[in-house]
Amino acid sequence: MNSSAKLLKEEILMYLEELSQEMGKENLKGEILVFGGAAMVLAFNSRPSTKDVDALFQPKSKIYELSKRIAERHQLSPDWLNDSVKGFINTDSFNYKLFLRFENIAIYVPDPEYLLAMKSISMRLGIESSDLEDIKFLIEYLKIKKLEDIFNLIKKYYSREQIPMKTYYALEEIFQDILDNNP
């Protein structure tokens, strides 16, 4: 695999298990809370791949160090596992559940409601982004029937000031597309 390739579910799980083994060699235990495309791939099977694993993790510096070793070993991007999502996370306001436990690392995913809210405020537009498809999937997964309910859900986690205008416009368009395709 080269550094620009997408990560398939099986590959992500393999690298996370390898990370767990590396943690065990150092007598450490860790936790990883997965967000973004990796959560969509792992927990929801909504798409086959993602470009990286956006997550919060502990112990942070050790997991970073070990993930870099795995990247070198498998010719992955050095930031295949990263915490760049942290700027969009309000850690006090959402629930998460255990997705998978390896011997030395527990993998968690946020509730789909929070994932929808977070993806909505952090959405990227353009052909390289899967955010619009992820948002549409989560709206349908949660069986949301009214646009107003989506905005109310987002406001449970983020203040009105944190919601970009593009979110309002994009969600209106996504919701209309859902209605048009599911009369």
Residue ranges and their predicted role:
Residues 1-183:
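Compositionally biased terminal segments of proteins
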